[in-house]
Structures are given as C-alpha cells and as structure tokens.
Regions:
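Glycine-/alanine-rich, low-charge beta-solenoid repeats
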Residues: 18, 24, 36, 42-44, ...
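Flexible, glycine/small-residue-enriched loop-and-beta-strand segment within the central core
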Residues: 1-35, 70
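Beta-rich strand-turn-strand
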Residues: 27-42, 47-51
C-alpha cells in the first residue's frame, strides 16, 4: 500500500498475492496486497479480499467473509 503522511505518499510497500491450486476468482473481485488464497477456494464476483482466505472456502462481500466451507 502506501504511507499516509505527505512525505510518504510517493512510497509504496508492495507485497505478493499468493494463489493456491484450483482457485476460482469471480469477475471484478479485488484482492489486496499480501493476501494468500488457499487451495480450492472460491472468491465471489465483486468481493474485496482484505485478509487471507482458508483452503476449501467460499468468500464474498465487502469486505470478503466466509460464506461456505467446501466439503469434498
């Protein structure tokens, strides 16, 4: 992201987004920096993911929350 103080606004602090295996991302979903999405997870369309997503879950909303656990 970036600093809030005027002298820090030009600096950014990038972090990777890590996607597990077999992840589905819906259209217009926003995933913030530093988030890890676990294996077999689904991110609903339009969701804003601000925290890590556990494996085998469906998340959605603003901010994204667990909507369902996927059972095999």
């Amino acid at each position: 992201n970036h600093g809030l103080a005027p002298e820090e606004r030009k600096s950014t602090y990038p972090a990777p987004i890590v996607l597990g295996r077999n992840v589905w991302i819906g259209s217009n979903a926003t995933i913030l920096q530093g988030v890890t999405i676990g294996d077999n997870a689904v991110v609903a369309a339009g969701a804003v993911v601000t925290k890590d997503v556990a494996a085998n879950t469906v998340v959605g909303g603003v901010p994204a929350k667990i909507m369902k656990h996927i059972t095999k």
